[in-house]
Amino acid sequence: MEKVPMTTAGFESLKEELRWRQQEERPRIIEAISEARAHGDLSGNAEYHAAKEAQSHNEGRINELEDYIARAEVINVSRLSGDKIKFGATIKLLDEDTEEKKVYQIVGDQEADVKTGKISISSPIARALIGKQEGDVIEVNAPGGAHNYEIIEVQYI
């Protein structure tokens, strides 16, 4: 069974989603199915079919979450250190073309969210950053073309 690297915060977030799906969403869906059944004929009952579809989606996500949680290799980022970039690092970059500064944290695939600055360990930019250090320049081939970034700061917070 292949381990999946994950930050402590990401692990807690997945556990909370699993709890919510099992203890709140599952009973709500079961109640919706029960109510729809009470309306009689199920063949043309859109409410029933929608509730059954929601149940299928929820149960699939529960199975997925249980798998990720079982395979999680939880890494406490605050205990990491060093000059080289690795999983969990928070990196401040300078886009050499636009002079725009960006801050990213390298996290596991399941906790990645570019809007909040969390990038997947398997993303092109994270792969380019791993093993580098402050002062290095990386080139990232993105859909919009190649970008050069200077690594300004590396932290483990």
Swiss-Prot record:
Give the UniProt keywords, A-Z: DNA-binding, Transcription, Transcription regulation
Key word Transcription regulation present: yes
What GO molecular-function term can you cite, just one?
A: RNA polymerase binding
Gene3D superfamilies tied to this protein = Transcription elongation factor, GreA/GreB, C-terminal domain, Transcription elongation factor, GreA/GreB, N-terminal domain
Q: Name one GO biological process term.
A: DNA-templated transcription elongation
Q: Which family does it belong to?
A: Belongs to the GreA/GreB family.
The record describes the protein's role as: Necessary for efficient RNA polymerase transcription elongation past template-encoded arresting sites. The arresting sites in DNA have the property of trapping a certain fraction of elongating RNA polymerases that pass through, resulting in locked ternary complexes. Cleavage of the nascent transcript by cleavage factors such as GreA or GreB allows the resumption of elongation from the new 3'terminus. GreA releases sequences of 2 to 3 nucleotides.
- Matching PANTHER family: TRANSCRIPTION ELONGATION FACTOR GREA
The record's NCBIfam families line, in alphabetical order, gives: greA, PRK00226.1-2, PRK00226.1-4, PRK00226.1-5
Q: What is this protein called?
A: Transcription elongation factor GreA
- Source organism lineage? Bacteria, Pseudomonadati, Pseudomonadota, Alphaproteobacteria, Hyphomicrobiales
Supply the gene name. greA
